[in-house]
């Protein structure tokens, strides 16, 4: 990392010298992410460097290239310092944890913004290092809608950034959605704990290792949602091992986090896993304009409920055997938040 790092806050400027990565009292994903890179990639680099800039409560327009915060330009200045000290350094990716303010701002074009962010970073970092390799963007899904009081569930599109992050992943091969965050612990309405930051960094490392090896990273997400009669069957990609409903690591949610809506006011009478597909049984034949959502604005609102693990959430995960290098916790792939039409 750079001196005074790993991440500069607000207007703070990091030093220009490189030093050992150590975490401040408010932990970043940096240490666990870089440790995971060194442990998990097929050909580990001689050195892994992590740096960045953060400013809480800022939307994309403030943080983007030319934005009012100057955050983007500080990251590029940091990159120039690193390249001056390590002339052979190249960038393998940009990690981003963002989306809450754009959710509050009802930014329905956030997927387009993420594509612009990736393209700008790739162009400008390539200009610094001289590399021709792609520089993908790794993101996670905002998981604090309920913490901000959004609890209307499937009925309305609100706090859209969490859905837009999934759109960006599906639409752009250089944007990788690592995971949701409802399975992590929060210390207030929107911020995860230090231990959760360490776990999140390990999730980033998992995704990075797949991409670095030339593979295609997929979070656990739906690929098809098909209705027939009074049932909806959902197929998934990104699964390692069998699907499971886990009400131990994530507090039990109504219908395991799934919700349904159509013009005939059908309701869910059962949710089950059959042959690693989720089958939703309804109170009657599927009506017009059917929708299914998962972990979407379905929690109890406010900071206290977010901290208690009762915010927006779901219980669907896979059976990945990967474990945390810090505490041995299983790094299951948890299903992303979604709200989609039934075919």
Segment roles from a protein language model:
Residues 1-343:
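Cell-envelope and extracellular/periplasmic
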């Amino acid at each position: 990392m750079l001196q005074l790092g790993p991440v500069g806050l607000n207007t703070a400027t990091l030093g220009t010298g490189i030093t050992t990565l150590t975490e401040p009292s408010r932990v970043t994903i940096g240490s666990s992410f870089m440790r995971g890179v060194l442990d998990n990639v097929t050909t580990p680099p001689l050195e892994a460097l992590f740096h960045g800039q953060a400013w809480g409560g800022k939307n994309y327009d403030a943080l983007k290239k030319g934005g009012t915060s100057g955050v983007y330009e500080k990251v590029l200045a940091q990159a120039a310092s690193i390249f001056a000290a390590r002339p052979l350094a190249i960038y393998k990716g940009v990690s981003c944890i963002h989306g809450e303010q754009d959710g509050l701002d009802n930014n329905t074009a956030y997927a387009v913004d993420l594509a612009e962010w990736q393209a700008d970073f790739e162009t400008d970092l390539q200009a610094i290092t001289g590399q021709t390799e792609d520089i993908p963007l790794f993101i996670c899904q905002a998981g604090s809608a309920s913490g901000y009081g959004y609890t209307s569930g499937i009925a309305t599109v609100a706090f859209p950034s969490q859905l837009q992050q999934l759109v960006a992943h599906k639409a752009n091969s250089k944007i990788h959605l690592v995971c949701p965050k409802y399975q992590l612990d929060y210390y207030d309405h929107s911020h995860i704990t230090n231990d959760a930051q360490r776990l999140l960094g390990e999730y980033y490392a998992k995704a990075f290792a797949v991409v670095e090896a030339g593979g295609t990273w997929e979070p656990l997400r739906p690929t098809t949602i098909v209705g027939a009669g009074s049932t909806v069957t959902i197929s998934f990609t990104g699964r390692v091992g069998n699907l499971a409903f886990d009400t131990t690591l994530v507090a039990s949610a109504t219908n395991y986090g799934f919700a349904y809506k159509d013009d005939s006011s059908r309701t869910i009478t059962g949710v089950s896993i059959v042959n690693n597909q989720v089958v939703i049984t309804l109170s009657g034949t599927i009506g017009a304009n059917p929708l299914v959502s998962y972990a979407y604005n379905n929690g109890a609102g406010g900071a206290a409920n977010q901290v208690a693990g009762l915010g927006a959430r779901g219980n669907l995960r896979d059976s990945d055997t990967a474990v945390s290098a810090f505490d041995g916790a299983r790094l299951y792939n948890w299903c992303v938040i979604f709200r989609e039409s039934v075919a």
